[in-house]
Amino acid sequence: MPTVISPTVAPRTGAEPRSPGPVPHPAQGKTTEAGGGHPGGIYSAIISRNFPIIGVKEKTFEQLHKKCLEKKVLYLDPEFPPDETSLFYSQKFPIQFVWKRPPEICENPRFIIGGANRTDICQGDLGDCWLLAAIACLTLNERLLFRVIPHDQSFTENYAGIFHFQFWRYGDWVDVVIDDCLPTYNNQLVFTKSNHRNEFWSALLEKAYAKLHGSYEALKGGNTTEAMEDFTGGVTEFFEIKDAPSDMYKIMRKAIERGSLMGCSIDDGTNMTYGTSPSGLNMGELIARMVRNMDNSLLRDSDLDPRASDDRPSRTIVPVQYETRMACGLVKGHAYSVTGLEEALFKGEKVKLVRLRNPWGQVEWNGSWSDGWKDWSFVDKDEKARLQHQVTEDGEFWMSYDDFVYHFTKLEICNLTADALESDKLQTWTVSVNEGRWVRGCSAGGCRNFPDTFWTNPQYRLKLLEEDDDPDDSEVICSFLVALMQKNRRKDRKLGANLFTIGFAIYEVPKEMHGNKQHLQKDFFLYNASKARSKTYINMREVSQRFRLPPSEYVIVPSTYEPHQEGEFILRVFSEKRNLSEEAENTISVDRPVKKKKNKPIIFVSDRANSNKELGVDQEAEEGKDKTGPDKQGESPQPRPGHTDQESEEQQQFRNIFRQIAGDDMEICADELKNVLNTVVNKHKDLKTQGFTLESCRSMIALMDTDGSGRLNLQEFHHLWKKIKAWQKIFKHYDTDHSGTINSYEMRNAVNDAGFHLNSQLYDIITMRYADKHMNIDFDSFICCFVRLEGMFRAFHAFDKDGDGIIKLNVLEWLQLTMYA
């Protein structure tokens, strides 16, 4: 049994009308149906608190490889094991696959034979033609290819059953390590295979990509652009061919010259992802078809040599075909790679040609310029050689550009960025990357059709600082491209996640608000039209679009079409000239009284047990004036001269109630605080609250107690009550329906009105902590939140002696501060 060694997935180095109308119904792209889904991961600051205290650094591929060689074992990946868990998550497969390493499948296995090329990719029994079309495009650019497929991997020299591949994931390059066990049936690969039966780079690349997304099933159905971007870090543009610009062929030629990746498809009218099954076909039916396909395939051929050692083409399974094959040989609902563009002389005229490839490795176009076209005899021999014309069933074919435009409906071009490929021929673009999150009840506001919540979406300020360098353009214009990408939806499919329908809008910030990073409020969006926006909201992983706007300051608002949909995203802005893109509301502060107050140090409970080390003599004397009781002053508190006369009726009533409950020591515990607060609050019938809970009162004491006694005196309680009264007014202002609750989306404004200025992450955390399942916050939770904010800011400022916004705590101080809260 091979020894198991831990793997790694480690990072590598035009304006609308004045009154905006509703957003049109979202477009249905070639993607899965938009819907709810598992929420994205919470912020790293929260996740990291559950990490082991002593972290173990993940081993790199080199370390794992070296360890396997030293121990003379073959690597076995425990994170993506060779069993059913790595295959399908929705249903158990009815037949048993045998996981084999390439040396067990054939003699003389090779990683790459004669260079990786597009004919090395033949689709197996998985609906991932979108992925394979992208891989075929990748082979056209060797520098890109070997960024994804690192050099020096083989089945001979230093072979240890371990391989690795690199993918771009939301702004970072990650190294994915796998073992080389592959699923087989009758000694044949079930999924992607090469045209040569002893070549395995494409099968292993598919496995690494499946691991990245959790399983092979997760690769079923998708858009070519997803894989293109994961291979390059580029940004994709979509073209509806029927609405294509007149110079589309020129655009495609330029894309080929620049090393961009291109894919195309024909709509089948079902609004499904490429390679998925027709409506109503579930995973069980898909598996049943796969079984029938295998049983009827050439795999049952008794003459098949299970350990063929030559490099002859492998005998492949015809893929499970859900796509609709047309009479012309093209397939609807299927992804093709665009592998070349040329102009050929035919009967004295130049004809524009497009070369395409079907990832099945078979089933080709049978019209003009196809492999078997009868009029090839009229094409010059040198021209044939230049076009590499040969009659072979390899899935690749030429067709005229006119036929291409007539039959195909969508074109996808993945443009490379500086992150993926450096070239002197390409213009340098400035790239800004922002990560964000839509949180239900706080920042998942939906599109402009939902004005009450649209303004709560994350907002990103964009400063276009310099105009384009275009001597032929008299306009003062900045060119830029915005790309919004949702994260982890494919990986979370097994948890019920689907792609959301997403889009964005761009608004110009008024000059008087330039430099102000505050979150723009609802009224701004009610009375200002957007300057630009995505063409449509669509359920795809990424939506992108080019814009040309004058230099100014703008705000980009990314959103889902429907509100309350929770997920993570990244927002990328590419511009020809310098720009600055950052999230609005990124400063944290609290409004402080103008009058300076004496800086009292924070007193920990343990400090009082240790001779009050943090208290000076002056502080103790001052405390003695405030705190009363036999153990502090030895006598009952005496009112100051004229104090009673100055007290209002409410204050007198307040003091009397407090005295009745607190007793002679004039201090109250959590139970007594609960009685005091609820006695007073119950008189305010308009609040419609059930009062404060005991746990809430314990938190109030912990956060308002200035000396660590675990109790509140009259002065401390009076300070608390003044705050509660002020916060009560804010609560009533936002409780517009007098239900005793406020909508969690309004909490941002309420917190701001109370003088606390937070960033988006903190507003998200407040919503998760205090809102109920209906996204409402009751009076008790509302006050608890504000008490906690007040106490936390007060504690921080007490430690921040030099006012630089940074404090240093030892572990005892940290535990005391957080435990007693």
From Swiss-Prot:
Region (Domain IV) residue spans: 650-820
Region feature (Domain III): 418-586
Cellular component annotations (GO), alphabetically ordered: cytoplasm; cytosol; myofibril; nucleolus; nucleus; plasma membrane; protein-containing complex; T-tubule
Residues annotated as the enzyme's active site: 129, 334, 358
Domain of life of the organism encoding this protein: Eukaryota
Species annotation: Rattus norvegicus (Rat)
Binding positions (Ca(2+) 2): 705, 707, 709, 711, 716
Family: Belongs to the peptidase C2 family.
Gene: Capn3
EC identifiers of the protein: 3.4.22.54
Name of the protein this chain belongs to: Calpain-3
Pfam families given in the database record: Calpain_III, Calpain_u2, CAPN13-like_C_EFh, EF-hand_8, Peptidase_C2
Start and end residues of each EF-hand domain: 649-683, 692-725, 722-757, 787-821
Biased composition (Basic and acidic residues): 622-634
Region (Linker): 587-649
Tissue and organ distribution: Skeletal muscle.
Binding site for Ca(2+) 1: 662, 665, 667, 672
Location in or out of the cell: Cytoplasm; Nucleus, Nucleolus
